[in-house]
UniProtKB/Swiss-Prot annotation:
Conorfamide As1a: this amidated form is active on both ASIC channels and nicotinic acetylcholine receptors (nAChRs). Shows a weak inhibition of peak current of rat ASIC1a and rat ASIC3. Inhibits desensitization of ASIC1a and to a lesser degree ASIC3 currents, resulting in a sustained opening of channels in the presence of low pH. Inhibits with a slow reversibility human alpha-7/CHRNA7 nAChRs (IC(50)=737-4984 nM) and with rapid reversibility human alpha-1-beta-1-delta-epsilon (CHRNA1-CHRNB1-CHRND-CHRNE) nAChRs (IC(50)=215 nM). Conorfamide As1b: this non-amidated form is only weakly active on both ASIC channels and nicotinic acetylcholine receptors (nAChRs). Shows a weak inhibition of peak current of rat ASIC1a. Shows a very weak inhibition of peak current of rat ASIC3. No inhibition of desensitization on both rat ASIC1a and ASIC3 are observed. Reversibly inhibits both human alpha-7/CHRNA7 nAChRs (IC(50)=2029-8464 nM) and human alpha-1-beta-1-delta-epsilon (CHRNA1-CHRNB1-CHRND-CHRNE) nAChRs (IC(50)=820 nM). It is found in: Secreted. This is Conorfamide-As1. It comes from Conus cancellatus. Both amidated and non-amidated conorfamides As1 are found in the venom. Amidation is important since amidated peptide is more active. Expressed by the venom duct. GO terms for molecular function: acetylcholine receptor inhibitor activity; ion channel regulator activity; toxin activity.
Length: 12
């Protein structure tokens, strides 16, 4: 799973 911060979209 790619690193997704809190402001990251669920597209990853």
């Amino acid at each position: 799973r790619i690193k997704k911060p809190i402001f990251a979209f669920p597209r990853f």
